[in-house]
């Protein structure tokens, strides 16, 4: 290697390092990444305590990673490079065999002890209340669309979490097996972990059949409201080549009253908040996003009062449930730590449904609320 060439490489390296360092200092910090759909780390001034504990360096490292100039472009470049060398995974996301158009988040199965504790909370709920309690886990996309997974992908849902949950369910709770409820190419979003409108409808049919409630097929045809949805799995994958998903609605909001409780007090809610269609988080169009509690009322329905202990999958399911139940109470344990037993009694609930995705049930830290 000639001295001139070595000097050129050294100079180029210095320009790269100092240039990006200067850009990091000059550029204003970003609060939120639309690409990754998450808040980014901010700079925290060091203190004697954080310097001694090493916490400052840990936080500063995350700050540099999050605020690195042109971060979104580098993430996509890395994904392209990984794909070109034949890798089937990037940033914890598997690339589907359909030319990488379906993205699968890695699924980590809980330990036997942890799963027993989690199902135990459901069993305690069944023992605490005097009304029927149903329990169902929604299989992960990697279970339903296993034929699209890359060969020998290790961290996927093989159905064993659901089977073991069924085996652990006590006599006071009726388990509803949804593993065979889904069919078709559109029951999940390719770029997100949630089920689509069509998957939610198939889940609704299976749940109602098990609970002995009439299934109502909405009038007309589903309406496409967005053709540019990129979900959370896409956000972490960097897979810039993937086509966007489409979002549909089907149930008319007419005749359905929604009351939301974002901070403990009732406020008028909506079945569909279409302002979210102009944002990255388009899935939050259903019910307007996460709420500790929401109540849907439909006096024309034939069912009674249903309480759903739920995660975000029920946002897309709720419009269908509102066709069958006069009242649907959506209780989100992520944000609502009140006594479920007391809620059932005070609101004269007729049936309780505990419904989570298998992945969320395996990781949610507030399931203990059900035992109160």
Feature-to-residue mapping (PLM):
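Extracellular glycan-modifying ectodomains
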Residues: 1-372
